[in-house]
Amino acid sequence: MRLSFLGLKRNPKLVKSILFHGSDPEIVAFYIKEYLSFSSTEPCAEEIPAAHVKSDPEGFITKLSMPSLFSNQVPILIKGATDSLTKTLSDPLSKIPEGQLVLLESSYLRATSSLRKLFESESFLGALTCFELDRPYVIDKIQSFNLN
């Protein structure tokens, strides 16, 4: 589903994975950092390069299905996501276990992007275009769709 900081269209608790994309990498990173600080007990995420997910999709699926040794799952952040990941991710994202959060970081994706379309069309996925760096506004809106 398309997420915005102007409000959610559906129940945010259904969202298992969020695609953060925008033209300014610093703004995208800021949104992710702020989101993690409010939505997760873990203030940081385990970063995985998109190229690694593409080259070893089975390893990524295994990582998603492994229970955490700790009480809370550490969010997974896929950095540098592009349309080339769409087919690789479509099935594993539908099988994300309860409590696991998968975030994707990408440069700006056009409305015709297959990855963006995937995240906007599925009810358990969300896409967020990061274009405004206004900290109080961002924090307020992130708090309004806290996944926990």
Give the residues covered by each predicted segment.
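Conserved beta/loop motifs at nucleotide-recognition and modification sites
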Residues: M1-N148
